[in-house]
């Protein structure tokens, strides 16, 4: 069974380096694409899904923003099973800060340059909300194109979808980005932060074995 995997905003496949995937799963990592100028979200999702063969069975795994993307792909090309990790099933899972950001539209006036690699304030914020106690957080945050980052943040804030109960959700109880109190996940990673694929790989590996094993 093929398993297509999409990482979180700004993160590459290395965030999954500690995960032991079920034997028999053929892993295919879908790397982030830089959005075209003023690209619509639906068009971007189509481009991210181009490597998927709709004529054969497959599963999807998405982390954080990747979890949102795989749900949108699933609407277009139904998967055998979809698991989202440290992500949300619907807008109700967003934090209060995200809701304030969406309503205020402040993100629209923030210049793209504010998200470049030399932006100390932005990357300090990333460290704080992902895992403030992990000094290696930026090791996994390698996709740093400023237009991609700003565009992605806008799409997360604007994302609107009806919850699909068939989606399997794994959440961490100390996640600041997508607080667990706003969701009703299938699995809870105790003591996990938004960086749980790295710090709680053993627990997540066991869940993936349970859900994907034997498919």
Regions found by a protein language model. Name each.
Residues 1-56, 104-115:
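Active-site catalytic motif of lipid deacylating hydrolases and related acyltransferases
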Residues 18, 72-73:
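Active-site signature of alpha/beta-hydrolase-fold catalytic machinery across serine-
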Residues 30-32, 187-192, 198:
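Short glycine-rich catalytic loops that host catalytic nucleophiles or stabilize transition states
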Residues 38-39, 192-207:
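Catalytic histidine-centered segment of alpha/beta-hydrolase-like enzymes
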Residues 61-70:
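Gly/Ala-rich beta-loop-alpha elbow adjacent to hydrolase catalytic centers
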Residues 78-113:
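Flexible "cap/lid" loop of the alpha/beta hydrolase fold
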Residues 115-157:
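Conserved alpha/beta-hydrolase catalytic His-Asp/Glu region
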Residues 169-171, 175:
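Short beta-strand/loop motif that positions the catalytic acidic residue
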């Amino acid at each position: 069974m093929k398993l297509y995997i999409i990482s979180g905003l700004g993160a590459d496949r290395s965030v999954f380096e500690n995960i032991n995937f079920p034997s028999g799963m053929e892993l295919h990592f879908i790397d982030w694409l830089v959005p075209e100028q003023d690209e619509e979200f639906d068009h971007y999702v189509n481009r991210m899904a181009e490597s998927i063969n709709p004529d054969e069975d497959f599963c999807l795994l998405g982390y954080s923003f990747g979890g949102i993307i795989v749900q949108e792909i699933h609407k277009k090309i139904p998967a055998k099973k979809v698991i989202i990790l440290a992500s949300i099933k619907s807008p109700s899972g967003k934090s209060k800060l995200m809701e304030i950001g969406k309503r205020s539209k402040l993100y629209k006036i923030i210049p793209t340059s504010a998200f470049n690699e030399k932006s100390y304030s932005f990357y300090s914020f990333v460290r704080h909300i992902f895992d403030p106690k992990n000094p290696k957080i930026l090791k996994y945050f390698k996709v740093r194109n400023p237009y991609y980052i700003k565009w992605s943040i806008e799409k997360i804030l604007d994302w609107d979808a009806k919850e699909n109960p068939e989606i399997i959700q794994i959440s961490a109880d100390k996640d600041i980005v997508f607080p667990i109190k706003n969701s009703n996940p299938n699995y809870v990673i105790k003591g996990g932060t938004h960086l749980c694929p790295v710090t709680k790989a053993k627990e997540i590996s066991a869940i993936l074995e349970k859900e994907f094993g034997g498919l």
